[in-house]
Structures are given as C-alpha cells and as structure tokens.
C-alpha cells in the first residue's frame, strides 16, 4: 500500500472519561503512518494530564472557550488542521472511536478511486452497553436534506478541507454544526458525496443526547430546522445557487409561526 500520511484531528472538551479509549483506537490502527493532533477547548477536567501521558501527539490548548459549541467545534478542527501535515484528514470527536481497520480501509478506498476527495463511513451507535449499526443510506443523498453521518465519520483530502472551511464558517447559525455544513457543501458545491458502505466508527450517544431538546417535532426541533433552512438559503446566496422554497421550507416556516 502506498504510504500516505494521515492526520487524525481530535476535538476535545471535558471528555477525560472517554479520551483514553478514543486515543487508543488510533494508536492501535492497522495503518501506521498516522499523526494525532488534539485540540483541547479549555477543559476543566483532567483531559490534558491524560493526553500528556502519550508520546508523539500534538496538543493545541485553547485558552478561552466561546459561547456556542458549534463554533467552538469548527474552530477546534480548523486550528488542528493548520498544524497537520497529512494528505488525508480524519475528524474525530473525543468520545468516539475508530475500528482498528478504519484508516486502512479508507485509504484503500481512496487508492481504488482516484477521483474521490471525500467520503463518509457509516456509524455504529454506542449507548451504554448497546450497539446499533446504521444501514446504507446512499439513496437519501438525492433528497434536499442529504443523510449526513456524524462528525467522526467524515474523511477528506487535505486540499478539499482547505477550500471548504472558509465557505462554511458563517458565525451566525449557532445551531448548525459542522457535519451538516460539510454535507451541504459536498452535495451542492463539490457534488462529491460518497458513503462507504461499512460501519467503521463507534459514535457514542450520551443520556443527554437521548433526552435532547431537539426531539423530533418538538418546538426546538422546528426552530433548528428553520435555522437549517436559513443556513442553506444564505449558503446558496453566497455561492450563486438558486434557492427554491420547497414544501419542507414552507411547512417549517408555518410551524415556527405558531410556536414563537
């Protein structure tokens, strides 16, 4: 196999409970030419002490955490990217894990298809002692809202990350996280939305996530959906793409009228 250098960018904030398991999932990869860069977002727990036990890990310490988690996450990955040297960029949240063959499998996919500039693998949802595999959802990418796997399933070539980051980093959509922004960019600008039909990432779901205020059809869910539509509308405007007010858009605005 061609010895392609890989950068795994890890965004961490107060995740000492899972951080060691996360790092070890990279250290134990069957593919070896990997650098690990961890951006710690002013953690108040023992995250830094745990990271310092490892050799050959680049640590970026952010002194001041911002108000919105979505902006903090984008900042973390961008700062980590600027320190990286890999040809292929893997994103990983610090409570998630890679299967030990993930990097090797993904690199093989890039080598087999030279036109690929990005891909998503499929997650395994991990909640307490239960695991749930997500099935292939390739067909859904034809919809207005593409199916977007979690953050830690995203992989892309270095040059694409650089081109993309400044075109998705609008700091006035606080409920719109980086995975959604990346998905919209790849679908409508790059037109390169490839899902690798293998479950290679353990995506951890906490009780807080299960009990989230963003439950389907809750008022918070409709408000965030409206913000997602506004993000897409602004994104289309910035990139000279015609925005069509489809049924979903009209329904979302209708529901938000009654829950204000």
Model-derived features with residue positions:
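Short aromatic/hydrophobic "clamp" motif used to bind/position activated sugar donors
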Residues: 89
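N-proximal low-complexity "stem/linker" segments adjacent to membrane-targeting elements
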Residues: 1-25
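Flexible acidic/His/Gly-enriched loops in nucleotide-sugar-dependent glycosyltransferase catalytic domains
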Residues: 62-79, 103-163, 214-215, 232-233, ...
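Hydrophobic/aromatic residue at the end of a short beta strand that borders the catalytic acidic motif
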Residues: 92, 98-102, 156, 178
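Short, acidic, metal-binding catalytic loop of nucleotide-sugar glycosyltransferases
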Residues: 24-33
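Acidic donor-binding/catalytic loop of UDP-sugar-dependent glycosyltransferases
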Residues: 46, 96-109
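Conserved nucleotide-sugar donor-binding catalytic segment
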Residues: 139-217
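A conserved acidic beta->alpha catalytic loop
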Residues: 40-49, 64, 93
